[in-house]
Amino acid sequence: MSGRRSKRSVRGVGKRSAGELARPPRAALPDWMGDSRVFLPQGYEAGYRYPLLVWLPGANPFDLGRAMSRVSLRNFVAVQAAPPATGADIAEPVWEAIDRACSRLSVHPDRIYLVGQGEGGRDAFRIACRQPRAFAGVVSLGGGFPLDEALFARIADVRRLPMLLCAPRDADEAAATQTDRTLRLFHAAGAQLALRIYPAAETDNVSRAMLADVNRWVMDGVCGAAEPRRAAYAT
């Protein structure tokens, strides 16, 4: 995935070599302990560059540690972006979270994924489509793709960006119509979208099955497995 990122996309990353990103100072690690917005995998190794999951929560309370325990305890470093200030650019907290993780932890700079929940999923789509070279993929858990916002302006780059939309089966008619329009849009544009539909979620429209699929889908991308562009349905 090298070459997909732009130096402008993640501020500061372009100023550091891959070796510097792979070997953060061990003395810095204790600063992260007890930070609820940071998740370190079990058996964290500073010499291995981990995929980074950047979480954008929805309006409801969010527990990063609990979410990651259902995604994977070993595969990823994860950070939670702070809520943007009123009227501020929704992407700014994301860049700040990425900068902080890349400067202090062992993160692979070409394996950064956005994962959003609810409205956070819609924002994840917005941010990733506006800066598609900055990310290896984007996942939305229950947040529909923002239609009619010209998010395919950089279509050549967007076509290379894998996206996953996880939706509840019991969605209302309006949500179902939006999903249908989204599939048509992606098909016409030749962009990559995997759609997976699940039984009713446990809480906040997010189920254990959704979170387990986040792990599988991201690791498929990390390991080079091709994600089919057709819709996929989970039961």
Task: Label the model's feature ranges.
Residues 111-158:
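Primarily recognizes the serine-hydrolase "nucleophile elbow" in alpha/beta-hydrolase
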Residues 50-102:
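Active-site machinery of serine-nucleophile hydrolases
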Residues 1-51, 126, 180-188, 192-194, ...:
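A domain-start/cap signature at the N-terminus of enzymes
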Residues 49-51, 74-77, 109-111, 133-137, ...:
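Loop/turn elements at helix/coil->beta-strand transitions in domains of secreted/extracellular proteins
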Residues 65, 91-95, 125, 176-183:
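Short, surface-exposed alpha-helical segments at coil->helix boundaries
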Residues 55-59, 80-84, 115-119, 140-144, ...:
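Active-site-proximal beta-strand/loop segments in catalytic clefts of secreted hydrolases
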Residues 142-222:
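The feature captures the conserved acid-bearing segment of alpha/beta-hydrolase catalytic domains
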Residues 42-48, 88-119:
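Gly/Ser-rich "nucleophile elbow"/oxyanion-hole loop immediately N-terminal to the catalytic nucleophile
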